[in-house]
Amino acid sequence: MRAVVQRVSFSEVRVEGKLRGRIKQGLMVLLGIKKGDSKAEGDYLLEKIVNLRIFPDEEGKMNRSLLDIEGEILLVSQFTLYGDARKGRRPSFSAAELPELAEALFDYCVDGLRQRGVQVETGTFGAEMLLSIENDGPCTILLDSEKLF
């Protein structure tokens, strides 16, 4: 499982021109699920995400977590995080989980964040979406449950 975590002061997602989710201060998280991922990978990433100390403290140092600032998360599924462009010009997405299995794991992650006390907004799984992101910093962190980076 992979996540692109962006510290934002504002983010929203629209589906077919209609607002689907909007947050203020918090994290915009793009989540990719690969074949074979399980709840264990989800739990690992969720703990990382909510506890990442990437928000500034009183001295301006990145020392506070999403939980510390009581921030929100906009969580959007993105299978293209498992795109492999090493050969040719068209990426292969064969490492991405099948949609029906990925959706169940995505829903598990949404519930897991809410159980951790986080306000969560989402896009629509499998839909074409338009994201607006006001990246604060900018601050973008890449996470991988296999600890590849």
Swiss-Prot record:
Superkingdom of source: Bacteria
Keyword Chaperone among UniProt keywords: no
EC number from the UniProt entry: 3.1.1.96
Residues spanned by motif Gly-cisPro motif, important for rejection of L-amino acids: 137-138
Alphabetical GO biological process terms: D-amino acid catabolic process
InterPro entries in alphabetical order: Daa-tRNA_deacyls_DTD, DTD-like_sf
Q: Which GO terms describe its cellular component?
A: cytoplasm
Q: Which UniProt keywords apply?
A: Cytoplasm, Hydrolase, RNA-binding, tRNA-binding
Q: Where mainly found?
A: cytoplasm
**Any one GO molecular function term:** Ser(Gly)-tRNA(Ala) hydrolase activity
What is the documented function of this protein?
A: An aminoacyl-tRNA editing enzyme that deacylates mischarged D-aminoacyl-tRNAs. Also deacylates mischarged glycyl-tRNA(Ala), protecting cells against glycine mischarging by AlaRS. Acts via tRNA-based rather than protein-based catalysis; rejects L-amino acids rather than detecting D-amino acids in the active site. By recycling D-aminoacyl-tRNA to D-amino acids and free tRNA molecules, this enzyme counteracts the toxicity associated with the formation of D-aminoacyl-tRNA entities in vivo and helps enforce protein L-homochirality.
Q: Tell me the subunit arrangement.
A: Homodimer.
Report what the protein is called. Answer: D-aminoacyl-tRNA deacylase
**Which species is listed as the source?**
Syntrophomonas wolfei subsp. wolfei (strain DSM 2245B / Goettingen)
Task: Please state the gene responsible for encoding this protein.
Answer: dtd
